[in-house]
Amino acid sequence: DHHHSTDEPSESSKPCCDECACTKSIPPQCRCTDVRLNSCHSACSSCVCTFSIPAQCVCVDMKDFCYAPCKSSHDD
């Protein structure tokens, strides 16, 4: 169980995504296009960030699903 807890996201430890784009293939190929500051969500394995300050980061992982929206996680 190799969990890298060095850059733990401050928002929440659960991965989430508001802007998710999927192809119409079977299985679908989904990519989260959310831009986050300084880090990607906790389950992201390929995080690409700009060199600006603060860095704007996008997760480029391809999944066959979308994560739950981040906005709804504040209501429970």
Swiss-Prot record:
Entry similarity comment: Belongs to the Bowman-Birk serine protease inhibitor family.
Gene Ontology terms for molecular function: serine-type endopeptidase inhibitor activity
Disulfide bonds: 16-70, 17-32, 20-66, 22-30, 40-47, 44-59, 49-57
CDD domains from the UniProt entry: BBI (cd00023)
Alphabetic keyword roster: Disulfide bond, Protease inhibitor, Serine protease inhibitor
UniProt-annotated site: Reactive bond for trypsin, residues: 24-25
Any one Pfam family match given in the protein's UniProt record, by short name: Bowman-Birk_leg
Single GO cellular component term: extracellular region
The protein's name in its UniProt record: Bowman-Birk type proteinase inhibitor DE-3
Reactive bond for chymotrypsin, annotated site positions: 51-52
Organism name: Macrotyloma axillare
InterPro entries attached to this UniProt entry: Bowman-Birk_prot_inh, Prot_inh_BBI
